């Protein structure tokens, strides 16, 4: 798409690349959706709650939801500095994986003694996510399609085989597909082999999942304030006091669910490393384009590279692909 000039200075975009991006829009695909709910009011004045949840991403929403389900009489309040799902929960590829260790290979390397337990808990967690979506009637475009982990280089085929051997030692029966079997599922000449995890990955619309959890919380009586940043937390007798721009909250308990936005507890700063994720999304594929690609199973795909290496179909048959650094 671009080339460096003779002096090695900043690359120049080619005319073809410029044409292909002429109508592209640099926005968050999932959040730019006509089904986005209207913003909720900000907190103005002083309120009290049994539990205050700070952060309106998945962690905060599920914390509030489970707390209210466990004790309907508990007064639960959630505050979000922007809007629900605005940050990482609405800015990802929409792969919902059972792995708690960011991939089984990482789990085997770092937690060999606990790996089997972590895998079991991860499967139970994914089942629980699906159960919550079903219970509350959340339209999150949830598809439990599984995932193909794909080798596109010869050395990656060897890596897949070794990985399968390690999984087998832990009681897993990995499904390995050769070149012909893999290309029969997705028609790419670059695919040399794959491992198919049929049940450990689901695809979702990340923002719709967050918005659905928001509505489930509201239906149960959770108070949610958007555009309400917590600027300070101090002890207040048997509870905690939270300061906001136009109000305050006194909570008996506080759950911080702010991910990288942890300046309220500065001692956590050394444990946070930002990860930048990028995605590109095509226009909806035509029927002819869909036939050319195959991909009838709509599996999530991830090749064994380390940049733009994951891709999937959206509900309206766009191809989304992305990666992180």
Pin down the residues of each PLM region.
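Flavin (FAD/FMN) cofactor-binding and adjacent substrate-gating region
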Residues: 17-26, 31-33, 102-108, 131-212
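Glycine-rich active-site loop/strand segments that organize a redox cofactor
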Residues: 91-120
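Glycine-rich Rossmann-fold phosphate-binding loop(s) that bind the pyrophosphate
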Residues: 55-59, 81
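Active-site substrate-recognition segment that forms the wall
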Residues: 94-96, 127, 135-143, 230, ...
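A non-catalytic, amphipathic alpha-helix used as a structural packing/dimerization or gating element
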Residues: 113, 117-131, 162
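Extreme N-terminal leader/targeting segments of oxidoreductases
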Residues: 1-51, 69-70, 74-75
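Glycine-rich FAD pyrophosphate-binding loop
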Residues: 68-91
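Helical element adjacent to the flavin cofactor pocket in flavoenzyme catalytic cores
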Residues: 158, 165-168, 194-252
